[in-house]
Swiss-Prot record:
Peptide chain release factor 1 directs the termination of translation in response to the peptide chain termination codons UAG and UAA. It comes from the Bacteria. Its main location: cytoplasm. Methylated by PrmC. Methylation increases the termination efficiency of RF1. Signal peptide: none annotated. GO terms for cellular component: cytoplasm. This is Peptide chain release factor 1. SUPFAM superfamilies: Release factor.
Length: 365
């Protein structure tokens, strides 16, 4: 029997076992265990349903093929052939859907994120582009019914951002935005360019899953907290008190400074949220590096020094270099219509993973 069918049969058995356990009065009375089993059962429900239907379809295909061999009636033959064609189409679709459902899932996919955008090469133009990217992601988040909150920002005099951090919360945020990690290049004529020459600038985007308290433990002894007087805009109140906070995670050397809020406590809360996300991301990146040594993914490496996309304003063109995707609708993409780009990246990643899954295993057919 095909190895994949063996795995599916195992899932079917486990699903039946879970349903039996969840009907046990002792389990029902043990809330935490019942919730754990319920979550596992819900996670298997879709693939079990599709596999159950696939088995029915395979059985119907066998019956129709036998009927086709035995019948001598021409009208019946045509009816059976038509049924077989429909069944084969459904079979192929179910097999593909099941293969995708069997792909290893990213445990972070359902998490909220902290996104950091930084102006990189290109001076003022890079900071302006960082602001444009921020606006693009905010509009996309709005289209997905996600919530956004700016939690840290360093603005520039020209109206852009040296760096800006945003929390995005909602359903499956990380699963869609994790591919945005990397360097984004813009080619356009700056407003200050009198000769009409196209300039090239870059901004980097970091997407980090929100720390939920169980992913990695931050011990108090590993965190150094320094407080100091805030500088810059904010008024006399800020400058008279030590409201700014700098947190250092000693084992990794990661530093977060926060002075945007009016009170030290507010700055502490936001600094800790960013620090937790960065430390978690640091350890995740180390694990990913080990994983990538055995499997390279064109879209999932998350290397922030890698140029992933070019935005060419004169030609209204956006190109994602990882998958060779070019779309001539930059104006709409910058207005938050990222769906086509993100869907293409997800499909490409799934296709890569399917090839990995099928290496050494037979097809379902």
């Amino acid at each position: 029997m095909d190895k994949m069918f063996e795995q599916l049969d195992g899932l079917l058995d486990r699903y039946a076992e879970l349903q039996e356990l969840m009907s046990d009065p002792e389990v029902i009375n043990e809330t935490s265990r019942y919730m754990e089993l319920s979550k596992e059962e819900a996670g298997l429900r879709e693939i079990v349903g599709k596999y159950t239907r696939l088995k029915e379809v395979l059985s119907e295909v066998t019956e129709n093929e036998e009927l086709l061999r035995e019948t001598t009636d021409s009208e019946m033959t045509e009816l059976v052939k038509a049924d077989l064609e429909e069944l084969q189409t459904e079979k192929a679709q179910l097999e593909q859907e099941i293969k995708i459902l069997m792909l290893p899932t990213d445990p972070n996919d359902e998490k909220n994120i902290i996104m950091e955008i930084r102006g990189a090469a290109g001076g003022d133009e890079a900071s302006l582009f960082a602001g444009d990217l921020l606006n693009m992601y905010q509009r996309y988040a709005e289209s997905q019914n996600w919530q956004t909150e700016i939690i840290d920002e360093t603005a520039t005099e020209v109206g852009g951002f040296k760096e800006v951090a945003m929390m995005i919360t909602g359903k499956n945020v990380y699963s869609k935005l994790k591919y945005e990690n990397g360097a984004h290049r813009v080619q356009r004529i700056p407003k200050t360019e009198s000769q009409g020459r196209v300039h090239t600038s870059t901004a980097t985007v970091a997407v980090m899953p929100e720390y939920d308290g169980v992913d990695v433990e931050l011990e108090a002894k590993d965190i150094r907290v320094d407080v100091y007087r805030a500088s810059g805009a904010g008024g006399q109140h800020i400058n008279k008190t030590s409201s700014a906070v700098r947190m250092t995670h000693i084992p990794t050397g990661i530093v977060v400074a926060m002075q945007d809020q009016r009170s030290q406590q507010q700055n502490r809360v936001k600094a800790m949220k960013i620090l937790q996300a960065r430390v978690y991301d640091y350890y995740e990146s180390q694990n990913q590096s080990e994983y990538d040594s055995s499997r390279k993914s064109a879209v999932g490496s998350g290397d922030r020094s890698e140029r992933i996309r070019t935005y060419n304003y004169p030609q209204n063109r956006v190109t994602d270099h990882r998958i060779g995707l070019t779309l001539n609708k930059l104006d709409r993409i910058m207005n938050g219509e990222l769906g086509d780009v993100i869907d293409a990246l997800i499909l490409f990643d799934q296709t890569e993973k399917l090839e990995q899954l099928q290496d050494g295993t037979a097809h379902l057919s």
